[in-house]
């Protein structure tokens, strides 16, 4: 018996062109590139999500910054308003305090004003009495040109020239002494009042005491000034608009009589 013959044949399958291109393309790209391509879509979504989140975060931060700034401004305005109200309150307190001080000062000044009014009434009364004596004088050629008061003293200008002794007698006739100048201020005041002429005052040289003496033999705050003037012994002092000067007592000048009030009215 003979063995059966075995016939071998080769089967070749022809791939389609599309499938061949796909296979060849995958073979060319390799496995890494294919995986990257598969993952590229989720990565883009992540980036976009992060971008949107960052934008929203920036917007939120900006809104918060604006709110914080507005809160800070509002807080500052409230603080300034409170300070202004506090300052106004302090000013009102100061005004009330000053008003109270003014009221107290007005109360304190009331006795002084009453004293001044009483003093003026006393001066006017004294002048009225003295003026009556002067007006009733029978002497001719003698009169008062003007008079005025300074402090508690009144002055009378006798516009009739006479010697120092004659002026002394004229003033005494009206119950007035020759004027005694109490201090520097009174001297300046009298010099401001006098016209361009010379007037006897109540200062002369006392030959017995060998010193200058006022008509009442009392002291004066003007003594220091008169000592510095180095008046010559033996004379009398006259007053002009610019100076005090010693001269012969027999010279003829106008007279200034003066008298203090007896007391401050109580």
Curated annotation (Swiss-Prot):
**Keyword set for this entry?**
Cell adhesion, Disulfide bond, Glycoprotein, Lectin, Membrane, Receptor, Signal-anchor, Transmembrane, Transmembrane helix
What membrane topology does the annotation report for this chain?
Answer: Single-pass type II membrane protein
Stretches assigned to the Cytoplasmic side = 1-44
Q: Which Gene3D superfamilies match?
A: Mannose-Binding Protein A, subunit A
Q: Does the keyword Transmembrane helix apply?
A: yes
The protein's matches in Pfam families, at most eight in alphabetical order, are given as:
Lectin_C (PF00059), Ly49 (PF08391)
Q: Which residues are glycosylated?
A: 87, 104, 250
InterPro entries hit by this protein: C-type_lectin-like, C-type_lectin-like/link_sf, CTDL_fold, Ly49_N, Mouse_KLRs, NKR-like_CTLD
Location in the cell: Membrane
Q: What does this protein do?
A: Receptor on natural killer (NK) cells for class I MHC.
**Subunit (UniProt):** Homodimer; disulfide-linked.
Name-wise, this protein is: Killer cell lectin-like receptor 5
Q: Which organism is it from?
A: Mus musculus (Mouse)
Q: Which gene encodes it?
A: Klra5
């Amino acid at each position: 018996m003979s063995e059966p013959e075995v016939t071998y044949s080769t089967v070749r399958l022809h791939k389609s062109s599309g499938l061949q291109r796909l296979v060849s393309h995958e073979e060319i790209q390799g496995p890494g590139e294919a995986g990257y391509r598969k993952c590229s879509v989720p990565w883009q979504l992540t980036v976009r999500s992060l971008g949107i989140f960052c934008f929203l975060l920036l917007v939120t931060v900006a809104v918060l910054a604006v709110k914080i700034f507005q809160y800070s401004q509002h807080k500052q305005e409230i603080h300034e308003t409170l300070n202004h109200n506090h300052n106004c309150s302090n000013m009102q307190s100061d005004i009330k305090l000053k008003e109270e001080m003014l009221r107290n000062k007005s109360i304190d000044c009331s006795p002084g004003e009453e004293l001044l009014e009483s003093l003026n009434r006393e001066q006017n009364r004294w002048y009225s009495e003295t003026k009556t004596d002067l007006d009733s004088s029978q002497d001719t050629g003698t009169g008062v040109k003007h008079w005025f008061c300074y402090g508690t003293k009144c002055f009378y200008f006798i516009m009739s020239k006479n010697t120092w002794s004659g002026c002394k007698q004229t003033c005494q006739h009206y119950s007035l002494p020759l004027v005694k100048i109490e201090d520097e201020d009174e001297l300046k005041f009298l010099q401001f009042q006098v016209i361009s002429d010379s007037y006897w005052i109540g200062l002369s040289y006392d030959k017995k005491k060998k010193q200058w003496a006022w008509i009442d033999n009392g002291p004066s705050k003007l003594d220091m000034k008169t000592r510095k003037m180095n008046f010559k012994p033996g004379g009398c002092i006259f007053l002009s608009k610019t100076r005090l000067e010693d001269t012969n007592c027999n010279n003829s000048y106008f007279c200034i009589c003066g008298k203090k009030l007896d007391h401050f009215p109580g």
